[in-house]
Amino acid sequence: MKTHKVAGGGGVRLHVVEAGNPAGRTILFIHGGSQSCLAWSRQLDSELARDHRLVAMDLRGHGLSEKPRDAYGDSRLWADDVRAVIDALNLDRPVLCGWSYGPLVILDYLRHYGEDRIAGIHFVGGITKLGSDAAMSVISPEWLSLVPGFLATDVEESVRSLESLLRLCFVQQPSASDLYLMLGYNVSVPPYVRQGLFSRAFDNDDLLPRIRKPVLITQGAKDAIVKPEVVDQHKAGLAHAQIDIMPDAGHAPFWEDSSAFNQRLRAFVEMCSAAAMGRPAIA
């Protein structure tokens, strides 16, 4: 696996990993809040690698990317991060695959740069708005109850909340070794970063109907963090989106049922490639 350091928005250094076939169709994976590129290990080290170029970035403030104190409220910075990875690695019309908070970053990119450089969009257990009653209506009370711990500077309180978060992600609980790997990269994200992520307030209701590239929305039917009703929010703005409900999965279907997830993602990427020249893109 290759690693890269890319200068993102405002010069923040981003950690990026790459696996798979350099000549294959490209997927850029964008993880959720407090996670890291390691969340995608069951994609990066899978049968997808045979035919696809697989790239995963650590968001600013996460993983091995730089963690500035105050650089999380500006949509343009997030957009610049994604654009920088596309440019630095010369990604050829990637499918952008975002989990949980990741779709917000994808939409930041689309707002500022349009969709002419991408082939398609994949939302996984994702949200598209923050800081409003409509945004909060699709977030579970169990997750909301953990927010004080996410923001706590007391180590024990923070770790307890993050472990509870991880357990909420899964219907079938991960092994102890997997759980504590995940906990490690969650704990590496400072509380001020989580504060910055969730202090943003915006919706993308104006942007979603303008998207013309193919969209796949994957949602675990047993998601205990983002309620499955979020799909109705997405469909209101993305009438052309494909909807994939995974009946036995929770918030992380790419981990819990990676084989089925990867198969569906592969088919979507192939469809995006076939459609790449067939539809006009938003500017």
Locate the predicted segments by residue:
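Alpha/beta-hydrolase fold catalytic core
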Residues: 1-29, 49-52, 91-92, 119, ...
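Conserved HGGG/HGGXW glycine-rich cap/lid loop of the alpha/beta-hydrolase fold
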Residues: 12-68
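Conserved acidic catalytic loop of the alpha/beta-hydrolase fold
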Residues: 77-94
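Gly/Ala-rich beta-loop-alpha elbow adjacent to hydrolase catalytic centers
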Residues: 98, 102, 106
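Flexible "cap/lid" loop of the alpha/beta hydrolase fold
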Residues: 107-153
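Conserved alpha/beta-hydrolase catalytic His-Asp/Glu region
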Residues: 132-138, 152-209
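Conserved serine/cysteine hydrolase catalytic core
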Residues: 192-236
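Catalytic active-site module of serine/aspartate enzymes centered on a nucleophile-bearing elbow/loop
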Residues: 241-283
